[in-house]
């Protein structure tokens, strides 16, 4: 009998949620997703020190004379994300998601400019924009930035998405893909209710993604739905049939080992017949987020967490740059 992973792959595009190149080689997914936390974890791995050094060297060459260490580190954050993305694309056949600095989540123009820069960095390596998804937090400003980018042919993945309002606003803006965070929705409900277990289809994260998926298919939206941030295998199984699921290596390994029949839960034909075409203007969007305590708290927490990961990455890069400089000085003497 085929493994659960093999069966899942026949009905859903399985995506690797990692920046670890060895894990991607092992599972051979079509696509891969990264975020600041995953890039930071990979950057801490001694196996990738040469990649970090190449990123620093590339940044030095890209900057004009007289640059400061602050300039260098900011440039290298972009470079290192693209260097990891480049290596990932050597392994997979599909797309890699590279995230815009989370600290720009409430600045539309800065997000657009950063996305264009990332695409240009990939272009310098001979990688076409069709293989890149630019990850942007699903704030109002982020969605507006993505709408601009999509019109330029830059495909986007709207992340940190926690409710129906965010999802529909992305779809109406003709965004390529959204990443609703299943597990983080579950985390919030566990913390608030004191309930330790939500089984199968009762999982609030599963309920949210199912609602979004069915509405999108009924209304004919082209925006792809990629479930993300899983806490257990049941969440993954309950979303079998979703357009894409991005899954951490530890769960990919468990799915690979497990046998048994996997039942498809989501299908284009399973619709819920909404009579309303939802559309959220800015004031409606902000009010909806304000009224949804879970979504507003988790969006804020996610942006804060990714921002801290970037700051830690900057510290790591600065430390490595200092080590390289000191080594060169010692060698020169």
UniProtKB/Swiss-Prot annotation:
It holds the Pfam family TAL_FSA. Disulfide bonds: none annotated. It is an enzyme of class 2 (transferase). One of its GO terms (biological process) is carbohydrate metabolic process. GO terms for cellular component: cytoplasm. One of its GO terms (molecular function) is transaldolase activity. It catalyses: D-sedoheptulose 7-phosphate + D-glyceraldehyde 3-phosphate = D-erythrose 4-phosphate + beta-D-fructose 6-phosphate. Gene3D superfamilies: Aldolase class I. Transmembrane segments: none annotated. Its EC number is 2.2.1.2. SUPFAM superfamilies: Aldolase. Keywords: Cytoplasm, Pentose shunt, Schiff base, Transferase. The keyword Cell wall biogenesis/degradation does not apply. It comes from the Bacteria. The active site is at 135 (schiff-base intermediate with substrate). InterPro entries: Aldolase_TIM, TAL/FSA, Transaldolase_1, Transaldolase_AS. The keyword Lipid biosynthesis does not apply. Belongs to the transaldolase family. Type 1 subfamily. Transaldolase is important for the balance of metabolites in the pentose-phosphate pathway. Homodimer. This is Transaldolase. It comes from Prochlorococcus marinus (strain MIT 9301). The gene is tal.
